[in-house]
Amino acid sequence: MRCPKCNYNKSSVVDSRQAEDGNTIRRRRECEKCHTRFTTFERLEELPLLVVKKDGTREQFSRDKILNGVVQSAQKRPVSSTDIENLISRIEQKVRANYENEVSSTAIGNLVMEELAELDEITYVRFASVYKSFKDVDEIEALLQQITNRVRGKKKSSIDDETH
């Protein structure tokens, strides 16, 4: 590894540990010539994953594209950037674990909606309203009814757990 200060190409690893995301190794290195310490990150190189859009075109999987959609949907909501980053990481892990070369944009959208439903219902509705391209109020009302039923089901099961 080349030293960022003197450009010497030999360094020794002083410390090595797994980074917070679990997919990266963080290494502290020391230049053998000028003794400058610097940090490097080692990450598994992943094969490119293509997203097949609804019109049949293909584009490279973009974590940032998902991030932008979720951030926009979560505006003025009590959702932290850490929550969003963790959500995006879970989605990317699921996509890479379940699809080798190609994944449909519909599958990604459904994964995002599943994750958002657990994170924040308003963010979920905002994302769904754009993703699903609702044609009328009845479709939005049906989505809200699904959420209401799911929330009631969770509350009922937690009450049942407390009484037993």
UniProtKB/Swiss-Prot annotation:
Cofactor names: Zn(2+)
BP term (GO), one: negative regulation of DNA-templated transcription
Domain ATP-cone: from-to ranges: 49-139
One Pfam entry name: Zn_ribbon_NrdR
Organism: Streptococcus uberis (strain ATCC BAA-854 / 0140J)
Source superkingdom: Bacteria
Disulfide bonding pattern of the chain: none
A GO molecular function held by the record: ATP binding
The record's free-text note on cofactor binding: Binds 1 zinc ion.
Protein name: Transcriptional repressor NrdR
InterPro entries: ATP-cone_dom, NrdR-like_N, RNR_NrdR-like
